[in-house]
């Protein structure tokens, strides 16, 4: 696998990566998907047990069918957590939820979706690093992504739709596609507010 195609410097990849929820419909070449998944499995994993598994969707009809389930799952979670049942319920100040609700509508049209799962014991500690590797590799190829989840309401139907065994743990749904709009760098709180030195609450020597 020609991993030298991932030419973006690691610093650029990490510091310019951000969640992308608006995608073009252009298909992603299968060789790029292959490279992205190869990058994912190179991530650290507990005991080198390699329990991570990836189910990749590229069939438009299958993605469209999954999009219906994803839409239902997204709104089920919003109703449970916030009492929202439609976009008009989302307060104006909750801009991130507005954007996420657009993905709930558009998931059916994305060119590729990856499900990050794990075989028994099914823990996420090996899947989370792989998912980040996957998204960084995609970013290096100009492909946007965002990690999302589902809701218990749809899990039985989700498993049946894709013949996923009961003992396989689902962790993330990751849509992939070329960004439809230009994005700036992400905004984060200063690490001086979120990091401590030697003892909880003790400040770090930077601002």
Q: Which residues does each predicted region cover?
A:
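Glycine/small-residue-rich phosphate/adenosyl-binding loop
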Residues: 50-126
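Short alpha-helical scaffolding segments that buttress acidic/His motifs in well-ordered protein cores
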Residues: 14, 36-40, 174
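Small-aliphatic-rich amphipathic alpha-helix that forms the alpha element of a beta-alpha
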Residues: 35-40, 112-161
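A glycine-rich helix N-cap at a beta->alpha junction
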Residues: 75-86, 162-187
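C-terminal helix-cap and adjacent tail motif
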Residues: 2-6, 97-99, 172-207
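Conserved, non-catalytic sequence blocks in retroelement Pol enzymes and Pol-derived host proteins
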Residues: 29
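Glycine-rich phosphate/pyrophosphate-binding beta-alpha loops
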Residues: 41-49
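Generic N-terminal amphipathic, Lys/Arg-enriched alpha-helix
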Residues: 9-26
